[in-house]
Amino acid sequence: MIDYKGAFHTGEYRNVLEEYGYDPLLIQERLADTWRVLFEGDEDARIFHNQGEDLGYMLDTGNLDARSEGMSYGMMMAVQLGHKEVFDRLWRWTKRYMYMETGENSGYFAWSCNPDGSRLSDGPAPDGEEFFAMALLFASHRWGDGEAPLNYGTQARDLLRTCIHKGEDGIGHPMWNPQNKLIKFVPNCEYSDPSYHLPHFYELFALWAYPEDRHFWKKAAEASRDYLRSACHPVTGLSPEYAYYDGTPNNERGYGHFYSDSYRVAANIGLDWEWFREDHWACEEANRIQAFFADKQPEDYRRYAINGEAFEEKALHPVGLLSTNAMASLAATGDNARASVELFWNTPLRTGPRRYYDNCLYLFTLLALSGNYRIWTPE
C-alpha cells in the first residue's frame, strides 16, 4: 500500500493492476475491449445506442429504460477515455428529453425515460445530477466549452446551484439538506442513500462551482465522510441502501439492507482515498468489506443485513458487487486486496438482460484500478 498524498495533490495515479503483476499492454487491451463491447458491440452486449445524427442513450437492459444514473455514468466513462462524440450524444439526449423546465423539479433531470425519450417519471434521482455535474466539469477542462448545450462548465455550475438552492423561492426542494449538508435519496424526502455520497466529487465542486457555492461543497465533503462512518457497519463494513441522517438503516420500504445500491459505497470510498487521502478510516472500511466477502463465492452472493446475516435472496448483480469490492483495493491494506482484484480480473463482463448495472460498475473499476479514473483540471 503506497501512502503518498492523494492523486489530486500529486497528479500520480496508482495502477493497482500493474502493481499486482498484470501486463500493462493487457490492461490497456482489456480497457479498450470493455469500452468497445459496451459502446460499440453487438446488440446483445452493448448498453450504449446511437440515436439519429447527434444523440445517444444508455439502456438499462433489465428495465428497458434510460436512466439519469446510466446517462451520467456513460458521460463519465466517455470523458475519462476521451470519447467526445459519445459524451456529446449522451448530453444532448439528456438535455432534450430528461431536463425539466417547469414544475417543482424544474432544473433537475427526470430519472427514467423510454428509449424514445418519453418520460416515465417526473422525479429526479440525485446520483444522476452529481455525476452529470462532475462529468461536465471534467469535459470542460479536457475539451473546452462549446455552444449550448455543450458549454459544459456553465451547465455544470448552473446544475450545482440548482441542487443546493432549489426551494429557496418556495418551489421545489434541494437535493442536499441545507443544514446537515447531506445528499437526499430524492429531493422531497429527508433521508439518504449511502451510495450517493461522493466526497471526492464535492471537494472538486468546492473548487469549480460558482464562488458563492464553494463553501457549501467543502462542508458537504466533510459531512459525507462523517456520514459514511456512521452508515457502514463497524464489523462487516456493509451499508444499507437507504439510511436516515444518523446513518442507521431506513427499512421502511425494505431498503435497509446491503443490496444493489449499497455495492457502490466500496468503490466510492476507494476512489475518494485515491484522489484525496483524507481519512484513514477508508482503509479500515475497505479491509472490512473485503474480509466479509473473502469466503463467499459470487454465485452465492445474497442480500445481507448490515450485520452480515444472509437472506435467502440471491444478489441480482454479483459482477457489480465483486467489481466494487475490487475497487476498494485502492484503499485496502489487508490480505484480501490482491484476491479481490484477481477475482475481478478473472471475471468477464456480464451477459444477458441484467448486464447494464454490473458492467457499468465493471468499467468504472477497470478505470480506477488501471490508474485511468482521473481528475481533469483546468488548463
Label every PLM stretch briefly.
Residues 214-222, 338-345, 378-379:
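Alpha-helical repeat scaffolds
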Residues 78, 91, 136, 153, ...:
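Inward-facing hydrophobic residues that define packing positions of alpha-helical scaffold repeats
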Residues 27-73, 78-121:
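Internal amphipathic alpha-helical repeat/solenoid segments
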Residues 75-82, 131-142, 200-207, 267-274, ...:
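Short glycine/serine- and small hydrophobic-enriched flexible loop segments
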Residues 343-353:
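Solenoid-like repeat scaffolds
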Residues 2-33, 37-40, 45-46, 64-68, ...:
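Extended ligand-binding clefts on enzyme/binding-domain cores
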Residues 74, 86-87, 149, 156, ...:
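Solenoid-repeat scaffolds in large eukaryotic assemblies
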Residues 64-71, 118-144:
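Aromatic-rich carbohydrate-recognition surfaces in CAZymes
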